[in-house]
Each structure stands twice: as structure tokens, then as C-alpha cells.
């Protein structure tokens, strides 16, 4: 394989630039030409395919977002869209593609491989909801951003003896809420994978203030409901505390990636090029126990929920490549 391309698709994630940089520099070291596909699959169909060199990716390892830009392009799920994209790949002599994104991006990579263009998927999403990898590119940065914001909110919450419901991102997965909640000593962590009773939370808030607590921090995954709706339900269930709600929003998708995300992205990008060099396609790169691994894209893109909660309070990880997480009481005070 002499000529490959790289694209980013779907929602952006800190560390994508580091992954692109690794792909480009490893490809050059392997004697390959590398092209950047701008604007994801939409750019592929439109022919926005341009050569990249070492200088193209200089000084981007510390930058958030993706300099190749990203876009959602549902039309690529249809055969017509796929054939248009393949026509452009052939026109530019592309023999393999590295796709950085989430599960929707993986479906596109799977289609490319089926049409004879080996594609490698790299898990680029802050949600950490990709099967077959312990961590995704961008997750660590998103958790760190959420942690920093929650720490600041705790300060003002304590000053005014307030209850805060803080909504974090994650789509249908509760990973960001779980990690950020534990890291900040949140009083409650509400995630889609675990049930909760509103009256129990109200009782916990009341008991906390009665014993002298100066604040109450509830970290809520967006996949459960919005912070505004959750706050309203708290009041309907009898909460009388001074309540505020905050949605952290897209701040979690931006910013300079952490060292962990930069290194993870660099390792994954390098590994992807080595696989393409060997003519391997149709796989997604992951990390398990700090080692690079590959999983079939088909299974990776089509698995269901990553973990669920048993009646005993144990989180069972449906993804066999993630370690079980033991929490004695997920929705009790962790502070």
C-alpha cells in the first residue's frame, strides 16, 4: 500500500489532531503518501481530498478539535453516497483510509472495507462508548474539563449553601458523569446505566444539610434527562433546598487534550498505519490493559450498551474488554 487517507467524522474530540499527526508522520516514515479528507464523509464525496506532509501537521498535537474539520453525513449510509465517495478515492489513487470518530463513523469505515478499500477505525469520541477499547480519544480530556468545572461550581455552591444539578455530556453512556462525579466527590451520580429514586435523592439532600453540609452536588449524565427536567422533578418530589441547574455543554468537547489523550491518540494513529501497511482493513484499533489491539469493525460498531447495573449494586461491563467497576452504592454520597 503506497497511498492512504485520513478523515475525522462525527462529533469532534480533543486528541483528534494528535491522531492525525501520528498517521501522517508514520505513513511518511513507511514511505507512503498520505492525504487528508476534509469535512469527513461529506468531504470525501465532494472530493475535498488533499495531500499532507510533515509540515501540515506541525504544532497541532496540543490543539483541540480537528484541523481536517468534521461533519455528520447520514447520506453515506446509502449505497449511492458510498459509491460517490469511492469514486473520489479511486480518482486520487487512495488505497486505504484511517477513520477517526465514533460508532457512526465506524459504520462508514465498514462500508468502505466491504467495497474493497481497507479502512481502520480509531475511537475518537468523548463519550467513551466504543466497544473493544478501555478508553476513547478525547474521554480523558472531557472528564478533566468536567472535573475542573464541577470543582469551581462547588466553591460557589458552598458559599450559598446551594444544591447544584450539573449535566455532563456522554450521549447514552454515563462514563463522563461516573468518572467526573467520583473525581469531584459528588453527592449523587445519576447515569443511564443505573436506576434511582427521586424521593431517596430528596431525602439525602435534606439529611446532608441537616448534618451541616454546605453544598450538594449532583452530577447528571445527559442520557438520563436534562438538568432542567431533573431539577423540576426534584422539586415535585419535595426538595426544598436552594436549587440551581447547570449544563456544561460543548466546553467538554474543546480545549487542549491532556497528556493521556495525546499519547493515546499518537499510539493509535501509529498502529493504524502499520496495519494498513500490512494490507489489513475492517478493524478498529483499541487499547486494552495499555496495549494496542484490533477488533472487527462490524462487532465494534453494532454492540449495545457498554455496562449495566445489577440488583446488588455492581456495574457489569457488557464490553468484555472493559474492567468491572465495583461501587458499593453508586447513588450514595461519594464525598
UniProtKB/Swiss-Prot annotation:
Cellular localization per UniProt: Cytoplasm
Known cofactor(s): Mg(2+)
Binding, ATP: 11, 72-73, 102-105
Top-level taxon of the source organism: Bacteria
Pfam families: PFK
Record-level GO BP terms: canonical glycolysis; fructose 1,6-bisphosphate metabolic process; fructose 6-phosphate metabolic process
EC code(s) of this entry: 2.7.1.11
Protein function: Catalyzes the phosphorylation of D-fructose 6-phosphate to fructose 1,6-bisphosphate by ATP, the first committing step of glycolysis.
Oligomeric and partner information: Homotetramer.
Name of this chain's protein: ATP-dependent 6-phosphofructokinase
Native source organism of the sequence: Streptococcus pneumoniae (strain CGSP14)
Source taxonomy: Bacteria, Bacillati, Bacillota, Bacilli, Lactobacillales
Annotated gene: pfkA
Amino acid at each position: 500500500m503506497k497511498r492512504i487517507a485520513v478523515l475525522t467524522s462525527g462529533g469532534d474530540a480533543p486528541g483528534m489532531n494528535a491522531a492525525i499527526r501520528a498517521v501522517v508522520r508514520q505513513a511518511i516514515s513507511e514511505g507512503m503518501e498520505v492525504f487528508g479528507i476534509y469535512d469527513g464523509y461529506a468531504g470525501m464525496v465532494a472530493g475535498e481530498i488533499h495531500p499532507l506532509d510533515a509540515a501540515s501537521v506541525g504544532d497541532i498535537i496540543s490543539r483541540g478539535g480537528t484541523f481536517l474539520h468534521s461533519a455528520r453525513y447520514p447520506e453515506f449510509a446509502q449505497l449511492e453516497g458510498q459509491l460517490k465517495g469511492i469514486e473520489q478515492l479511486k480518482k486520487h489513487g487512495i488505497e486505504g483510509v484511517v477513520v477517526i470518530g465514533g460508532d457512526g463513523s465506524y459504520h462508514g469505515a465498514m462500508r468502505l472495507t466491504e467495497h474493497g478499500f481497507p479502512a481502520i477505525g480509531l475511537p475518537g469520541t468523548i463519550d467513551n462508548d466504543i466497544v473493544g477499547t478501555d478508553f476513547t480519544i478525547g474521554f480523558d480530556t472531557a472528564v478533566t474539563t468536567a472535573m475542573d468545572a464541577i470543582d469551581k461550581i462547588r466553591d460557589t455552591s458552598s458559599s450559598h449553601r446551594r444544591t447544584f444539578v450539573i449535566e455532563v455530556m456522554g450521549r447514552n453512556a454515563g462514563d463522563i458523569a461516573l468518572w467526573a462525579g467520583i473525581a469531584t466527590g459528588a453527592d449523587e451520580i445519576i447515569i443511564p446505566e443505573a436506576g434511582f429514586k427521586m424521593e431517596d435523592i430528596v431525602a439525602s439532600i435534606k439529611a446532608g444539610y441537616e448534618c451541616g453540609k454546605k453544598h450538594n452536588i449532583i452530577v447528571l449524565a445527559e442520557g438520563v434527562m436534562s438538568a432542567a427536567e431533573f431539577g423540576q422533578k426534584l422539586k415535585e418530589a419535595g426538595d426544598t433546598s436552594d436549587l440551581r441547574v447547570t449544563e456544561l455543554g460543548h466546553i467538554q468537547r474543546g480545549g487542549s487534550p491532556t497528556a493521556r489523550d495525546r499519547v493515546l491518540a499518537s499510539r493509535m494513529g501509529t498502529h493504524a498505519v502499520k496495519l494498513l501497511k500490512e494490507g489489513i482493513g475492517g478493524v478498529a484499533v483499541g487499547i486494552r490493559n495499555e496495549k494496542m489491539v484490533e477488533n472487527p469493525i462490524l462487532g465494534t460498531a453494532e454492540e449495545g450498551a457498554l455496562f449495566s447495573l445489577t440488583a446488588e449494586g455492581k456495574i457489569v461491563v457488557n464490553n468484555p474488554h472493559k474492567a468491572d467497576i465495583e461501587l458499593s452504592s453508586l447513588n450514595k454520597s461519594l464525598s
